């Protein structure tokens, strides 16, 4: 009997999905079962991942399958591959391996979806059309080439990246995510941001703690960089760190306390300059043989600030007024040279971040820096010179796009006239009035102040230039800081669509059905939650060697402590999983006919809706012990995608789908005329609800450089209304010939030429010399 059954298996044919028959091979079944069991891991007492099951469990299921095949196919002589897979699932459930069954079943479903990409005619056509567009069209004609504003889709490397992006996105949809998530994205119910990076398991963005990175130097993968010894190398390595980390993430890079991190470089530079100046003066005066220069060097090495009383050197110069004067002169020159070097370092930093490329050379890093609160002499020198270098612009006077600088405003530090850094706040306003940057964050906003500890800059909330914010950590209540962490991924909900279906805009009802609205919103949030968790599992399945700079160099806190084969869950759990939304204004118009700037009723409802979303995110955090946050989505590209689909479904609805975009997040619509104060008062309460990130913009007309006081008054209004992060947009013209930046009407105020007119070489030279 046994021999007969063995003979049966030897003659048994397996029918593949394409109808082809192959000889039965039991080892393939064993391998498939083993993969299912291996996908389930447990943690030991040290938190290390170990296999939950052993070979006995695998063998138990395998032998059961073989017996069933022998029993059920004695006469047929053939068996379909789907039947074998059904048997495996059935036996896993029957024997109580529910977790293995779940993973095996989900993997099988994903494999089926991936096959559809290549065997489903409609999907194949759509995929090939996307590839065709990349190869034959310019960025002006093809949306895919414009998806990332920081990538030039018309360059060779930019196009290469877009090819990879298109294939990766389709692979993610067909193989890595459940069908319900990809369908919700394609239908326009949700938008999964940076889907093309999902297969790689990258995280979004990062707040880089440069002090930890600089302490013993770091490696970019092609060589080790020593600990920096002066401000020039500090700024150079800061740019290199940003560039290197950009290659390990799909979002932007931010530095939460740039002034604090650069300050030690200023002190090191000053000590070098001070030693050199004293040596040169003593040498010039033939006094080296009478003064113990080694003692002077030792005293200088003890300094912990560039501000000190020269009398500390009195035991060296004693009663000699001439030598004391040498010390004073050396100090003055050392300060001057240090200040000049710091300016050059900041200038180089700005130029580097606008010229150095990452990601196969297709883009410059999306970089942000937070600064403004370091009151030390060294920190103040960094802040001042960074602002001055921003004010000067790039090589031909262009306004630098990167880094997006964010000036942190804080009472007692820089907000009031008596505050030590008040002069730097004034300078920040002046520079922003000309160059659009810096933006301004407000540490006194209640939701930011809650984390602030005086004297501990690590408790100051840092923002990304794009608005992302990360502070609280439900997984570690003793470490509520920004640095060394980042956002994992975020997905946005099409809020107007839910509102259209349940509001009065379609004239199907006289009053909005809010009960069903909240039910649909809750269901959609649950869907996004599950999608974020699915992506989180992909991220956690990676290893430290997949992200050599982010993890192996310890940019993500404790990443350097991982072993090569460790999974990433214990680190990534400190990041944020973020739900976003778009078009609150259109949602309110769809529900009740007015948006939040038009009526108090609409504002009340708007806060209720976003409050509902925030509360649900907080509940997710408690349920999963992960940082679920709510972001006011930065949706410059997404806003057009959603409304385009909704317009096709519902037609043009006045105030809802009658424009080419949905209004960004909770913003008051740009077309709505209202006062600055009213706009800020309407938007401010939403900052408190969107703990994952937010920003409010104010648009100003005219030349703001001629009225910096008015510009500053808007910043103060932001602070007083409770805004967390704000920016002012205003027109900026630039004369390409003489480089003037400001408002240009008919005649350039600087060189006097009209549009199209030449300007003499002599005048240009005089203007250039005036700027030196």
What does each of the following model-derived ranges do?
Residues 64, 68-72, 496-504, 590:
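Solvent-exposed, amphipathic alpha-helical segments
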Residues 2-134:
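Charged, amphipathic alpha-helical regulatory modules used
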